[in-house]
Amino acid sequence: MRSGVIAQKVGMTRVFTEAGEHIPVTVLKLGNCQVVAHRTTEKNGYVALQLGSGARKTVYMPKAERGQFAVAKVEPKRKVAEFRVSEDALIPVGAEIQADHFVVGQFVDVTGTSTGKGFAGGMKRWNFGGLRATHGVSVSHRSIGSTGGRQDPGKTFKNKKMPGHMGVDRITTLNLRVVQTDVERGLILVEGAVPGSKGGWISVRDAVKKALPADAPKPGKFRLANGGDEVAAPAAEQEGA
């Protein structure tokens, strides 16, 4: 199981195929996504990579956080996240994961925070049908109707769908296809929409419900901290070696 990456949503555009068909894509940018720390079975009880992305001023950071980045010899990061991996998929601390960590044509799962919509009614928030337009209904056309029973149970149950704050939820979209990658600019173009607003932080990982392509690099494509490029062999070549 390979590591994912932390990216920022740039926006949406479209790309054209050789046949002239256009594909709507979301542009995701890797902002110097580096490995900050390892989580091991011996020390933590599980295996994972802690990644960091984006620049952050140290003046706004607690001393403890600054110490963690200093130990890893990594510049302070604005966003930090963990990705569970297998033991053979650990990437050295300080290495920068590149955009071609994902190959064109493979499917990925993306996770982000949905755009906030503020206070919304039942029809917008939960797709309720509303009440009738006439025949005894006045003023309350967009209300949700009854919310509970009679004297028994005498209450409204928890998790009842009602008006309230809409958006700002953690959303995962499955099986988005990678259309293009740009290593020099650190861009990943995925087909379709990605949850969140422009500039929002997105987690991208290999699709859980789709097979990993044979040419996907393991443990990944990354640049070492000393400036050297680590070219990981595709999984098919590693198995045949």
UniProtKB/Swiss-Prot annotation:
The keyword Hydrolase does not apply. Pfam families: Ribosomal_L3. Methylated by PrmB. InterPro entries: Ribosomal_uL3, Ribosomal_uL3_bac/org-type, Ribosomal_uL3_CS, Transl_B-barrel_sf. Belongs to the universal ribosomal protein uL3 family. One of the primary rRNA binding proteins, it binds directly near the 3'-end of the 23S rRNA, where it nucleates assembly of the 50S subunit. This is Large ribosomal subunit protein uL3. It comes from Rhodopseudomonas palustris (strain BisB5). The gene is rplC.
